[in-house]
């Protein structure tokens, strides 16, 4: 989307050269509270961290099943998953489940409960993009 006043002010404050991102191999690892059950089998990475490119952030999740990504919401973020080669899982959003695999793209609007299940013979491998469409609440 177009840059709004928040984006312009943030870019001016950061004083960075674009693009500000990292290669997958150099990405920052993180674990979220709802993902504690997958910490040993799946890895979550930030490729471009929140708030540094205005309202956008990007990352990558990879690992093996069986596993579960607990149901959670993002109050400020719309989110897209792009399923990468070898990736396969059951994705649930707002109570509806669908099986996704390589080449599929999901969209989840802000405040929508969502999570995933990865079967024993599946792998999680997806790139995510998030955007705080209306800016961040805090």
Show the residue positions of the predicted features.
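Extended, charge-rich intrinsically disordered regulatory tails
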Residues: 134-138
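Conserved metal-binding segment of the jelly-roll/cupin
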Residues: 1-2, 100-120, 129-131
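Conserved short histidine dyad/triad with adjacent acidic residue
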Residues: 56-75, 88
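A short beta-strand-loop-beta hairpin characteristic of the jelly-roll/cupin
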Residues: 80-102
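Conserved hydrophobic/aromatic beta-strand scaffold that supports enzyme active sites
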Residues: 60-62, 80, 97, 105-107, ...
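A generic "binding-loop/recognition-motif" signal
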Residues: 76, 87, 96, 112-113, ...
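A short, N-terminal "cap"/entry segment at the start of jelly-roll beta-barrel domains
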Residues: 3-65
């Amino acid at each position: 989307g177009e840059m709004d006043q928040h984006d312009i002010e943030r870019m001016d404050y950061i004083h960075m050269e674009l693009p500000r991102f990292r290669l997958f191999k150099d990405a920052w690892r993180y674990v979220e509270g709802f993902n504690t059950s997958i910490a040993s089998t799946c890895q979550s990475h930030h490729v471009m961290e929140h708030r540094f490119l205005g309202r956008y952030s990007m990352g990558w999740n990879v690992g093996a099943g069986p596993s579960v990504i607990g149901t959670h919401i993002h109050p400020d973020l719309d989110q897209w998953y792009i399923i990468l080669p070898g990736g396969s899982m059951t994705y649930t959003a707002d109570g509806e489940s669908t099986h996704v695999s390589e080449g599929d793209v999901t969209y989840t609007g802000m405040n929508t409960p969502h999570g995933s299940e990865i079967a024993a013979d599946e792998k999680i491998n997806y790139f995510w993009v998030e955007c705080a469409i209306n800016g961040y609440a805090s």
